[in-house]
Amino acid sequence: MQYQNPNTLQAVILDWAGTVVDFGSFAPTQIFVEAFAEFDVQVSIEEARGPMGMGKWDHIRTLCDQPQVAERYRKAFGRTPTDDDVTAIYQRFMPLQIEKIAEHSALIPGALDTIARLRVQGIKVGSCSGYPKQVMDKVVALAATNGYIADHVVATDEVPNGRPWPAQALANVIALGIDDVAACVKVDDTVPGILEGRRAGMWTVALTCSGNALGLTYEQFRALDAATLASERKRIEAMFEGSRPHYLIDTITDLPAVISDINARLARGEMPQSN
């Protein structure tokens, strides 16, 4: 037997918040702010957005490791936050997130049509998220009422290590019966999500405008003037540079053109690992 490069894509692995649902990725961000506030520690929306894409416990740990947040915690409690403190914040975060997730469950405009176009091409739809399963179960149920059902879902606590490690993306490959990781594309609005796809050996597509990086509602995004939008795209592209996404697009509605381009590159013998 000989190895043969795949010549067409078999699967997309889609993130959830900021990619398919919750334009601007508001659900997790606001809850981080509220969870810290219950411990009398102020965290801004901008600070809360920083580690987005990681599993939520890791996200809180990363926030607590930031010097300015650690100092606020020290002033409130007389010590810097330990792992036990992180767990306490996480345990408050979880019920708040479950309680309020429905407020930010709308599908991103055009997502359903885009996914339908991919399925017509025989492309399977895997998915993963920085949410734990307890939250994902509710997110998945809400999305189903709006017409979106992924072929597979992997929550961050269903693998040994979440993003930026590749386990969630690779769990989708196994569950979907994909022949080769190079026949997959990971689509995400965060740096950890793009690193996940890169480390899994997949093609990667970073979303610049629908998710955490821009942090606007769909209406606010549509209202941006051309100069501001161009400036924001440039800022966000620089943010993603170190994770080396193969493509950067505004929203999931731009994905079909990318899929066509990747298929053409695969047909020429190109592989994601060599780019």
Swiss-Prot record:
Family: Belongs to the HAD-like hydrolase superfamily. PhnX family.
Protein name from the UniProt record: Phosphonoacetaldehyde hydrolase
Organism lineage string: Bacteria, Pseudomonadati, Pseudomonadota, Gammaproteobacteria, Pseudomonadales
Annotated keywords: Hydrolase, Magnesium, Metal-binding, Schiff base
An example Gene Ontology molecular-function term: phosphonoacetaldehyde hydrolase activity
Provenance organism: Pseudomonas fluorescens (strain SBW25)
Role summary: Involved in phosphonate degradation.
Catalysed reactions listed for this entry: phosphonoacetaldehyde + H2O = acetaldehyde + phosphate + H(+)
Entry binding sites for Mg(2+): 15, 17, 189
Cofactor(s), names only, from the UniProt record: Mg(2+)
GO biological process terms, semicolon-separated: DNA repair; organic phosphonate catabolic process
Record-annotated active site: 15, 56
Broad class of enzyme this protein falls into: hydrolase
Quaternary structure and partners: Homodimer.
Gene3D superfamilies for this protein: HAD superfamily/HAD-like, Putative phosphatase, domain 2
EC number: 3.11.1.1
UniProt GO cellular component terms: cytosol
Cofactor note: Binds 1 Mg(2+) ion per subunit.
